[in-house]
Amino acid sequence: YEIKLHGKNGCMAYRKGLQSGVRKQLGFALKDISEHLPGAFIIYRADKEDDELFYANNEFLHMAGYKNVDELFQITKKSFRNLIREDERQQIESSIWEQIDNGNENDYTHFHLRKADGTYLSVLDHGRIVDSQQYGRVFYVLFMDWEEMHIHYGDKLLG
């Protein structure tokens, strides 16, 4: 079972100390994790011209008021930039790409996220750029509701 944690169709010679307890990790399906993780996230194409949205978990849809992923894709035209308030778009996209172009695999930014009803939610965005075999370069992005963070963490955010 240990070899399964490193991908399908693998093999490994037996060696003393292989952990059978690792089997527990195999019981969690990606869908279970993405739908029950206490965090809103999306996945989108990491391309300055074509930032196509691929995925949003239920936590993101709920936080932003979208009924389902189809409504999200329709309203945003499947584009990440259409989630950013228009007057912030250029500055936020520049900030993200400047961080990546400077050799960082993570980016951090704060902006106003477009909700399904057209209102905006102040969010912290923590993105990571990765190479996907299937989609090429993509961003995995976690979102935190800025106001909720201040309510729950208050002064702890300041250090």
Where would I find each of the regions flagged by the language model?
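PAS-associated C-terminal cap
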Residues: 18-23, 27, 144-159
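Conserved beta-strand cores of small sensory beta-sandwich domains that regulate signal transduction
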Residues: 12, 42-45, 112
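PAS/GAF/H-NOX family sensory domains and closely associated sensor/linker modules
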Residues: 69, 78-92, 98-104
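Short loop/turn elements at sensory-signaling interfaces that couple input to output
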Residues: 5-7, 125-154
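Per-ARNT-Sim (PAS) sensory domains and their PAS-associated C-terminal
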Residues: 87, 91, 101-128, 134-138
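Cyclic nucleotide signaling catalytic output domains
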Residues: 1-6, 12-25
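PAS-family sensory domain signal
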Residues: 29-78
